[in-house]
Amino acid sequence: MSEHILVIDAGTTSTRAILFGRDGAVAGTAQAEITQHFPQPGRVEHDPQEIWQATLNCARRVLGNRPPESVAAIGITNQRETVVAWDRETLKPLARAIVWQDRRTADVCRALRDKGHEEAVHKETGLLIDPYFSATKMRWMLDNVDAVAQAQEDGRLAFGTVESWLVAKLSGGAHVSDASNASRTLLLPLGEAGFSADLCDLFCVPIEALPKVVDTHGEIARTDRAL
């Protein structure tokens, strides 16, 4: 019988794995720090591969000698606006993740506000046009990282927030994002079940590179048995 729920907390400075029993009691925890990269003033990056390895290592540590079958489900909580780009076929990251704290797209956001787009975007998404959110981070990667641009040209680009990246790695390729994360991209209208083509056009983000939006609960993918 599956006796545990495994929760992954992929935070800004560390990754944690917490194992809960059927009674809700904590059966074990493991934690690993995540390296912060500051390549220039105002820029903050993470290594997606480090996030993945920390997640995998913490999960294995917290499980100990328990069989994988003892875990009924895995839940993920994470730093929501951080953007990861990867090759959807190889599942390899194409660049460092741009973290929610990063301000490199401030000028792009200012230009969009100056053109009068903020009121409509706010009405549609509930968010303001700000570098904090994901859309302009995605556009920056396309404009400035050759591997990302090439992957888009080849039809292999996958964008996502951290939970989307981890689900892809855990499942062997599922490309999904739960609504609470997708809502922080500036690309998901309030009350809608999928990303907006018009918002993607405004922010110059290819909608085909985005994940499928799914509910925040229920089964969204199955783990790769090879893990």
Name the predicted role of every residue range.
Residues 60-227:
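Glycine-rich phosphate-binding/catalytic subdomain of phosphoryl-transfer
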